[in-house]
Amino acid sequence: MLAKRIIPCLDVRDGQVVKGVQFRNHEIIGDIVPLAKRYAEEGADELVFYDITASSDGRTVDKSWVERVAEVIDIPFCVAGGIKTIADAEQIFAFGADKISINSPALADPNLITALADRFGVQAIVVGIDSWFEKETGKYWVNQYTGDESRTRQTNWQLLDWVKEVQQRGAGEIVLNMMNQDGVRNGYDLVQLKKVREVCKVPLIASGGAGETVHFRDAFVEANVDGALAASVFHKQIINIGELKAYLTKEGVEIRR
């Protein structure tokens, strides 16, 4: 069995790390590079950086900080935000990123997934999916342009259909951002994760809802995800990554040292 991954997520806006609740009301957390360095030193397995307004602003990720991050950390990192072309991706890889993640641009042009996977290999291409649970209908929908509250919209894709589609097109990994849980810290949506796990044959990363160490354990043990992504519990030092890994090891979860 592959070891499970602990992945801090850094949402970036205007050169700063920010964090919201359910993708809204973002507060500034701090500077990108010192936070990245701290997480690497604490034992994070990789980092994910989302330039959250790039797609909604119609631009690509601000690359000025990508190179600076690559200089100070020695763990893999993934960059997302408005990547719409092979050239966009080439630049980000050239600055030192190990993976790229696409979300809204993939919804706008699903062929982009295949083009990027063919050019850089599936292992380097992550598809981020922002899901929203509609309580009235019991359906899970895929949302687009979630970095900007005023532009966020529900697509016509139901979650499981889109998960299947992106795999067929060459996604090497899926990060499921469960919007209802985001920043609330009451646990990952295990029901949703289990449904996605059934149809997801590539590595699946859970995102949205971590508040306590047991939430990570539940995602790994009950939903069998490959990685757990979290932001606010790490940013606010509610959970220390080293202590989290020690707890998971004690719980019998195989974790990277």
Swiss-Prot record:
Enzyme nomenclature, EC number: 4.3.2.10
UniProt record, GO biological process: L-histidine biosynthetic process
InterPro entries associated with the record: Aldolase_TIM, His_biosynth, HisF, IGPS_HisA/HisF, RibuloseP-bd_barrel
Keyword set, alphabetical order: Amino-acid biosynthesis, Cytoplasm, Histidine biosynthesis, Lyase
Recorded metabolic or biological pathway in which this protein acts: Amino-acid biosynthesis; L-histidine biosynthesis; L-histidine from 5-phospho-alpha-D-ribose 1-diphosphate: step 5/9
Chain coiled-coil ranges: none
CDD domains, per database record: HisF
Active site positions, chain numbering: 11, 130
Chief localisation class: cytoplasm
Gene3D superfamilies: Aldolase class I
Pfam family name, one: His_biosynth
Entry superkingdom: Bacteria
Gene Ontology cellular-component terms listed: cytoplasm
Molecular function terms from GO: imidazoleglycerol-phosphate synthase activity; lyase activity
Catalyzed reactions: 5-[(5-phospho-1-deoxy-D-ribulos-1-ylimino)methylamino]-1-(5-phospho-beta-D-ribosyl)imidazole-4-carboxamide + L-glutamine = D-erythro-1-(imidazol-4-yl)glycerol 3-phosphate + 5-amino-1-(5-phospho-beta-D-ribosyl)imidazole-4-carboxamide + L-glutamate + H(+)
Subcellular location: Cytoplasm
Subunit structure as annotated in this protein's UniProt entry: Heterodimer of HisH and HisF.
Family (UniProt): Belongs to the HisA/HisF family.
Function: IGPS catalyzes the conversion of PRFAR and glutamine to IGP, AICAR and glutamate. The HisF subunit catalyzes the cyclization activity that produces IGP and AICAR from PRFAR using the ammonia provided by the HisH subunit.
PANTHER family xref list: IMIDAZOLE GLYCEROL PHOSPHATE SYNTHASE HISHF (PTHR21235:SF2), IMIDAZOLE GLYCEROL PHOSPHATE SYNTHASE SUBUNIT HISF/H IGP SYNTHASE SUBUNIT HISF/H (PTHR21235)
Identification of the protein by name: Imidazole glycerol phosphate synthase subunit HisF
Lineage: Bacteria, Pseudomonadati, Pseudomonadota, Gammaproteobacteria, Pasteurellales
Underlying gene: hisF
